[in-house]
Amino acid sequence: MKLRKIMAGIVATSVAGTMAVAASAQYDAFIMYASGSWYPSTMDASGHSEDAASGTVTEWTAGTAEVTKDGTYTVSVSGIKASAVDEETGEEIMAPTPGEGAAVFNVDIPDLSTALGIGANCEGYDATMTAAQKMEFAKSKGINVTDVKITQVTDGETTEVAVDSSKIFFGDIEGNGKFRIELYNQFGETKNDAPLNVADIYFNESLNVTFTISGIDAITGGNIKPADTTAPADTTAPADTTAPTTG
C-alpha cells in the first residue's frame, strides 16, 4: 500500500472516535513530543491535533500519570496515526506513523510548579533565569527528579534510549506554572549539551519515560491542593467618561 500525507480534508469518522479524549488535567504528567521533522507531533495529552495549514490530522494515545506525591511515574505516547491518502485507491485513511528523532521531547505536568511554590509569581523565581538556575531554584525548595529512564517499542521489541540525567533540566522552565522535565528541546538549553542522542529515537508503537520525583510531600504535607490558575481581579476603578456640567 502506497501512502502520502493528506494535504486537505479530515478523516471525519476517525476524528469522531477520538474527540472524547480529555485534555491534560491539573498535575497529569504527559509526554510532549515532536519528531525531528516535526511530523508527527504530539504536543499535549488530548490525543488529537489538526494542522491548520495542511489539514493533516494526527491522533495518538497519551499515557498520563497524576503526580501529586513523591514517587516513581511512567508516561507514554503510543499508537500515533496521521491522515493520509492511499495512492492506489484514493481513500483517506489514518495511517500508523513512526516517530524518528526529536525536535522536542519533554515531560510536562500542568500547574505543579505553581502548586509547589517553585514557579512564576512565586517569591524568588525570576523569569530571566536560565533553565539551570530555574532547576536550582526548584532544588532549593527540596524538589528533585532522578532515575529517568526512556524506552521505546518498535515491532514488539523494547529498547532503551540512553540518557544522561545530569544534563536534564526540570522546574518551571517556561515560566507558565508547569513543571517540565526537559529531555531535549531544540529551542531550549538542552540543545547545547543534550542529555540523549536524538538519533537513537525510533518507534512505531510507543515512547515511554519513567522518572522519580521527590520533595512534593515535604512541601504539601501529602495533601496537594488545586493550583489557583485564575487571573487576579482587576481592581482599577473605571474612568469617569461623563461630560462635565457647565451649569
Model-predicted segments: where are they?
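Gram-negative bacterial Sec-dependent N-terminal signal peptides
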Residues: M1-S24
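Beta-rich carbohydrate-recognition modules and glycan-binding surfaces
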Residues: S24-A227
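Intrinsically disordered, low-complexity repeat and linker tracts
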Residues: N223-G247
